[in-house]
Regions:
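Positively charged n-region of N-terminal signal peptides that target proteins for export
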Residues: 1-4
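Phosphate-group recognition and catalysis centered on beta-loop-alpha active-site segments
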Residues: 18-286
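General helical structural elements
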Residues: 6-7, 50
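Bacterial N-terminal signal peptides
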Residues: 7-16
Length: 286
């Protein structure tokens, strides 16, 4: 019996070794696939800001926003310390958002970890600079989606690899500012979802010929309204349209009425990148 079983076992091992493994598909591709009458999404710029006591790029702020908007997206900025630790920070210097001073990339993590964050009103909070890893861990636990803005001093490949190592690809949309960067990241991982600037017909054509499938893209259509025909073309390809209302358009809505957010959805906007996530949620829910 043993003589018979051993060859069978060896055959089984060989068959298993020759069977191609099934590659896991990134579920974000389906999540960001445009569907007519789909739910409008809200992305909190810099993880949420503009609220007293809640600093930008702060994990506690994201938790606060998520309580009111369970499916909120969080745009975060990823920087690196002098000793190569990834953490959340928008500015190249520390003065505006922390109790520290000097250049971010000239401080080691031990120094940075001692600082406290300041809110938009220059009030010092009890909150501290979050590690990128801790934010990824939180996003996985809470099923949150991050849109990752990589600072110029940081290599995009390094950030992608860090996301992969932490098994957080399904929580991360990587923001790109050039088609070359988008192509580089897609080549490194064909499952990655990318935010790509498509603000006009020329950029649409560039994206269409870039060799990146539409399913890997979310279209950032800029910080001003585009011609609705652009939104329609993107929707035909199954691509969701993100409008950056942060800055001027948020100010316009605050002055003229938050009903403007509802009007922008009618033009074809699927995602708002905003400094006013709670107000946008209230406006589009009416």
């Amino acid at each position: 019996m043993k003589k018979i079983l051993l060859p069978l076992l060896l055959v089984g091992i060989l068959i298993a070794g020759c069977t191609p493994s099934t590659k896991k598909t990134n579920t974000l591709q389906e999540f960001f696939s445009y569907t007519e009458n789909g739910e409008t999404l809200i992305s909190a710029h810099r993880g949420g800001k503009s609220y007293a006591g809640y600093p930008e790029n702060c994990l506690e702020t994201m938790k606060y926003i998520k309580e009111s908007i369970p499916n909120a997206l969080f745009e975060i900025d990823v920087a690196s310390s002098e000793d190569g630790v990834l953490f959340l920070m928008h500015d190249s210097s520390l003065e505006r958002t922390t109790t520290g001073s000097g250049r971010v990339d000239q401080k080691d993590w031990e120094t940075l970890s001692q600082l406290h964050l300041k809110d938009d009103f220059d009030s010092i909070t009890d909150y501290q600079i979050p590690l990128f890893k801790h934010v990824l861990d939180w996003a996985k636990k809470e099923n949150a989606i991050l849109t990752v803005d990589i600072k110029r001093s940081v290599d995009p490949e390094l950030v992608l690899r860090f996301i992969e190592e932490n098994d957080a690809l399904e929580q991360s949309v990587i923001i790109t500012y050039s088609m070359e960067t988008a192509q580089q990241l897609y080549k490194l991982n064909p499952e990655v979802v990318l935010s790509v600037s498509i603000r006009n017909t020329k950029e649409f054509d560039t994206a269409a010929s870039a060799g990146i499938p539409w399913k890997n893209m979310v279209a950032f259509t800029g910080t001003i309204e585009s011609d609705p025909s652009l939104y329609a073309k993107l929707h035909e390809q199954g691509v969701m349209c993100m409008l950056g209302t942060l800055g001027n358009l948020d100010k316009k809505a605050k002055a003229r009425g938050d009903v403007l957010y509802k009007e922008w959805t009618k033009l074809g906007i699927d995602v708002f990148a905003t400094d006013r996530p709670l107000e946008v949620k209230k406006a589009i829910s009416k």
